[in-house]
């Protein structure tokens, strides 16, 4: 199999260190992976750049759910993007949609300008646009480096047909990065089915967080009531298995 670029979705400084140990050369740096990945702290970015050799794509996403942002959220994203670029991020990951689900080119252009020569990655907002191939053409025209997609399906394996069409449509003008539900069992299949030369995945495990055990009736999250006595972290063995499966 051809040389495959490995990008791991990291939710912390520790995740990034483990991703490098597993064999990744690039990460998408986030916080709150449970929510699909939100903007990381500046401190996290600075530590990752200081103590690893990873290419770091910094997520710019201030909240969960969709991608039609208020003016307050948009201003926050602009400031976060500037801080990330000024502090060594190798690229920005973001996406803006209008109310109708089409790409908001004007807002995208603002962050593209901030990123300058660094990578500009349009995230999985592409997976909810009404016409993904038309949207891909627009991303190419805007100057995006790469687009992350599951092929408008819950997993990249299920969306392999559309991902393959996107690779063909791109013709090398933009990189197509499959992500979503990639595991050691399907990673190589996705590569073969789509013709991509890179993959994006998270490989997590739960780790005990003992400090809350005195009162297990307390929850700090929302209605989903996530467990407070454990946290999701990157699993070195889990990441390594995916990479070795290629």
Curated annotation (Swiss-Prot):
GO terms for molecular function: copper ion binding. Coiled coil: none annotated. Its main location: cytoplasm. Disulfide bonds: none annotated. GO terms for cellular component: cytoplasm. It holds the Pfam family CutC. It is found in: Cytoplasm. Keywords: Cytoplasm. Belongs to the CutC family. HAMAP family: CutC (MF_00795). This is PF03932 family protein CutC. The lineage of its organism: Bacteria, Pseudomonadati, Spirochaetota, Spirochaetia, Spirochaetales. The gene is cutC.
